Amino acid sequence: MFTVIVNLKNYAEANGKNFVEFVSKLPKYDSVRLIIAPAILDLHNAHEFRNVEFFSQHVDDVGYGPYTGHIAIESLMNYGIIGSLLNHSERRLGEDKIISTVKKAQMLGFEIALCVESMEEAKRYSALKPSFIAYEPKELIGGNVSVSTAKPEIISEIVDICGTEGVPVLVGAGIKNRQDVRKSLDLGAQGILVSSGVVKSPDPVRSLNSLIK
């Protein structure tokens, strides 16, 4: 199934009361798996939306205990959160932390969309078999040039690399229209990771529909 993760980041347009309004307007798609990644303080509202799947934007490899400021998988699961982004370009981690967090998540049945910025990282981390590898070149994030246009050959190679491990690939950075999505799918990607193109749009639902329908 085609997967779309919408990362709300800390954008004011989808924060606090705006988050509730944003999610309330989302349509249900029969052939698309839609996942929303809200700001951490909005995750407690996830239980109000039983028909929406939620990821955290980050998670740590700790459990319950004396871990000030950390985000435990167990705590997220108690709120109905089913997975998390990990190693996003705005929240990068070291290799040891990535490995330990992915392994802990797998033990608990918690999904991880592991973000990578290069083919080398895709090679290194696909062997961990996260739920998804999300390829986002840092220099294209938030821009108007899509990754499918700027780096099509790298997407194809990452799809091949991850395919040998059975890991689906999402692509992000600069995805703004249906043509960008179609190019990504033609290159073998199984979904997209989007943010500002939807969240900061004057009509987020229309923008989302333009990518999906």
From Swiss-Prot:
Main location: cytoplasm
Keyword Calcium: no
Reactions it catalyzes: D-glyceraldehyde 3-phosphate = dihydroxyacetone phosphate
GO biological process, one term: gluconeogenesis
Subunit and interaction comment: Homotetramer; dimer of dimers.
Residues involved in substrate binding: N7, L8, K9, I141, G174
Alphabetically ordered keywords of this record: Cytoplasm, Gluconeogenesis, Glycolysis, Isomerase
EC number: 5.3.1.1
Pfam families: TIM
InterPro entries per record: Aldolase_TIM, TIM_sf, Triosephosphate_isomerase, Triosephosphate_isomerase_arc
Family indicated by similarity: Belongs to the triosephosphate isomerase family.
Function: Involved in the gluconeogenesis. Catalyzes stereospecifically the conversion of dihydroxyacetone phosphate (DHAP) to D-glyceraldehyde-3-phosphate (G3P).
GO function terms (MF aspect): triose-phosphate isomerase activity
The protein's name in its UniProt record: Triosephosphate isomerase
Keyword Lipid biosynthesis: no
Subcellular location: Cytoplasm
Recorded superkingdom: Archaea
Biological or metabolic pathway of the protein: Carbohydrate biosynthesis; gluconeogenesis; Carbohydrate degradation; glycolysis; D-glyceraldehyde 3-phosphate from glycerone phosphate: step 1/1
Alphabetical list of CDD domains matching this protein: TIM
Entry GO terms, CC: cytoplasm
